[in-house]
Swiss-Prot record:
Annotated pathway: Amino-acid biosynthesis; L-arginine biosynthesis; L-arginine from L-ornithine and carbamoyl phosphate: step 3/3
GO molecular function, one term: argininosuccinate lyase activity
UniProt cross-references to PROSITE patterns, sorted A to Z: FUMARATE_LYASES
Gene name for this UniProt entry: argH
Protein name: Argininosuccinate lyase
A Pfam family reported for this protein in Swiss-Prot or TrEMBL: Lyase_1
Organism of provenance: Desulfatibacillum aliphaticivorans
Superkingdom field: Bacteria
Length: 465
């Protein structure tokens, strides 16, 4: 246990052991060690540049900090609840290595702007990793869409069969979702990548520290403009968690469809053995546990967003100890999102779609009814009138247990004399799909173009254009 704390000068009694355990955050924030050390090295360089310490002292600090980093990564570092957090642990060990020189490192700095910096460095790194992981998932989806261009599948509304679409069109809908997710994370980086160090406790520092210089050392785009806001701002965490929640909702929606499609009732998809599990009692079972878990883990990430919003909602400026509670939900959400995106990127290329079952389902249930109405419109029948005609024809077919295209022309003409033999071609699955050529529609020419645009976009992201 540490004999003295860096702030205990005005205290007559030592901290209660239970209070030390209660307020300690080291088991959570120790993952920030590398970012904390990176920030401290930059701060030492800034102190030297301002003439507050010598260059030799800054060199010694950097060498000592790198030694601490090595000890942590080698598993030789000892943690102690009495030191509260990762900042104090690193400073305490640096003091053991350097002696009095280490005491100069915290000049012009508070733990308030120090943790604000660590959070931003950490989240900048993790956001970039997530963007890269989403790139892999999006590429996997595009590749699967390319491989299944001639597969048809029912499109659904209200979980009822609606109109047939290309499976590739369905998959590319998820590409659009995950691209928006990637764009949101990219946009969030602009607000994450701002340097708060130099704000000190809340009012700035009396030392002539060049904050722009520190920002350049750490690769930040700029510096914060208000010291009170800088140490109390957690908007960037809330924004990240909002983006993460939306991304997880997209993963959850896709998971739900994979679960449904792999069921015997749908049988559109065979979940690969490597991504399924069995039952401890029912030998025949093959359970889609991976998408089920992703669906379940969505609640954790959304819960993390609610946790930080609730923590921050009533805090006066500037820093409050409540903000220590920002890290558990943030870290958990980052870990969860990364695991789920990585799992999907690995699983999507292995999905086995049942072409015949999907086509048969697309050819049943009157998915071509809208096209029969459109056919009548092209013959001069007003759409609402055509809608009623087809509705009555559907009821007639239902009573006889048949599809529209299975009803004879003579029987269909009882509903409208505008119906001709060419109607049957208009009612085929292929024709229904290929007629939808408006921008964004499911016609193969559109889907092929969408895949091409996506490949170009992904390639540009890889090359950095």
């Amino acid at each position: 246990m540490a004999e003295h704390k860096p702030w205990d000068g005005r205290f007559a009694e030592k901290t209660d052991d239970m209070v030390e355990a209660f307020t300690s955050s080291i088991q959570v924030d120790k993952r920030l060690y590398a970012h904390d050390i990176t920030g401290s090295i930059a701060h030492a360089r800034t102190l030297a540049e301002a003439g507050v310490i010598t260059s030799d002292e800054a060199d010694a600090m950097e060498k000592g900090l790198r030694q601490v980093k090595g000890e942590i990564e080698a598993g030789n570092f000892k943690y102690d609840d009495s030191l509260e957090d990762i900042h104090m642990h690193i400073e305490s060990r640096l003091t053991e290595i350097l002696g009095p020189t280490a005491a100069k490192l915290h000049t012009g700095r508070s733990r308030n702007d120090q943790i604000a910096l660590d959070n931003r460095l950490y989240l900048r790194d993790e956001t970039r990793r997530i963007i890269a992981m989403l790139h892999e998932l999006r590429q996997a989806i595009v590749d699967s869409a390319q491989a299944h261009l001639d597969y048809f599948v029912p499109g659904y509304t209200h979980l009822q069969r609606a109109q047939p679409v290309l499976l590739s069109h369905h998959l590319m809908a998820y590409y659009e979702m995950f691209t928006r997710d990637s764009d949101r994370f990219t946009d969030a980086l602009y607000r994450i990548n701002v340097m708060p160090l130099g704000s000190a406790a809340l009012a700035g520092t009396t030392f002539p520290l060049d904050r722009e210089y520190t920002a350049s050392l750490l690769g930040f785009e700029g510096v914060t403009q208000n010291s009170m806001d800088a140490v109390s701002d957690r908007d960037f965490i809330m924004e990240f968690l909002s983006d993460a929640s939306i991304c997880m909702v997209h993963l959850s929606r896709m998971s739900e469809e994979l679960v449904l499609w792999s069921s015997s009732e749908f049988a559109f998809l065979n979940m690969p053995d490597a991504f399924a599990t069995g039952s401890s009692i029912m030998p025949q079972k093959k359970n889609p546990d991976v998408p089920e878990l992703v669906r379940g883990k969505t609640g954790r990430v959304v819960g993390s967003l609610m946790a930080i919003l609730t923590t921050m909602k009533s805090l006066p400026m500037a820093y409050n100890r409540d903000m220590q509670e920002d890290k558990p939900p943030l870290f958990d959400a980052v870990d969860t999102l990364k695991a789920c995106v990585a799992m999907f990127a690995r699983m999507v290329p292995k999905l086995e779609f049942n072409r015949r079952n999907m086509f048969d389902a697309s050819n049943q249930g009157f998915l071509n009814a809208t096209d029969m109405a459109d056919y009548l419109v092209e013959k001069g029948v007003p759409f609402r009138e055509a809608h009623g005609i087809v509705g009555r024809a559907v009821a007639y077919a239902l009573d006889r247990g048949r599809e529209l295209h299975e009803i004879s022309l003579n029987d269909l003409r009882k509903f409208s004399d505008k119906l001709e033999k060419d109607l049957y071609e208009a009612l085929t699955v292929e024709h229904v799909v290929e007629r939808r050529r408006t921008i964004g529609g499911t016609a193969s020419v559109n889907v092929i173009a969408a895949i091409g645009r996506a490949q170009t976009q992904l390639q540009a992201e890889t090359s950095g254009d």
